[in-house]
């Protein structure tokens, strides 16, 4: 359509020139040829075989984010034939050639920044012009870095095992929105930092479950897409978690009465022994308070007799008859006596001569 229109304009101009020429002029044909060769109105306009159009990559249709120091290398393909003219602008102004370089090819244009800085952020526009036609594409570039630290942090209150903190936002957010704050604690003894809250969006918080008897310091980092701030302010005061004074009131209770009159749980057993061989008699008694143990032979007290040795320990009573003779045979009695009563057990001992 564009080619046909251009040819029609050229034919019409040529007819107008021929009609205006005088046939009687001696130099008519020569002058006409000169006019045809030299008149600007007779020059044919270049034909547009392909309209200009920019094929913007999908990734660049939203804000293109890079970190400070990274390389920006954008290739933007376009169409247009013959080769169109390409013009780049940054925020409506020409590019700074000391920082940004552009390479234009037959079918694409490359925008290159070796080390991006925050000042390189903004709106970049590519304009492709061909004849009276043009196509434009806009690319938003955002160069970001780590945020600065919060300006201050203050320990507001300490109660029980809890501490209240407040801080102010950082002055520099790194050229992008903050994702939140990271709160950490460290006890005075170990000095190790542990994270309490991550990506916390408020500028005040309550730290709970602190250990009684410890003293804690706190610090806060700011965070954005690049990560945590390089430094963090630390509370000037320590949070001392005091042990609450507890008053114990003893409950009254009835003391159990364990008093008991003597009672033999294991009686004496009758035995037969041989003359000259030591013999022992055993029995068990239970009583509270501790009873007095008395040994009798044929109802005669044996206390103080060196031939016999009486022992009593943990309720076990024993009587040793040293080298018995036939005279030592008889009825032996063990008697237990305390304030609540008394009890006794008997056994018969026979002493035989050896065969």
Swiss-Prot record:
Task: Tell me the disulfide pairings in this chain.
Answer: 283-334
Keyword Hydrolase on this protein?
A: no
State where it is primarily located.
cytoplasm
For the keyword Ion transport, the answer is: no
Protein name as catalogued: Myosin-binding protein H-like
Q: Which residues carry this modification: Omega-N-methylarginine?
A: 322
List the SMART domains hit by this protein, alphabetically.
FN3 (SM00060), IG (SM00409), IGc2 (SM00408)
Q: Which family does it belong to?
A: Belongs to the immunoglobulin superfamily. MyBP family.
**Location within or outside the cell:** Cytoplasm, Myofibril, Sarcomere
Query: Region (Disordered): which ranges?
Result: 1-43
Q: Do you know which InterPro entries this protein is assigned to?
A: FN3_dom, FN3_sf, Ig-like_dom, Ig-like_dom_sf, Ig-like_fold, Ig_I-set, Ig_sub, Ig_sub2
- Role summary: Myosin-binding protein which plays a role in cardiac function. Seems to regulate conduction in the atria and ventricular conduction systems.
GO biological process per UniProt:
in utero embryonic development
Q: Which residues carry this modification: Phosphoserine?
A: 39
Which residues belong to any copy of the Ig-like C2-type domain?
A: 46-140, 262-346
Provide the Fibronectin type-III domain boundaries: 149-244
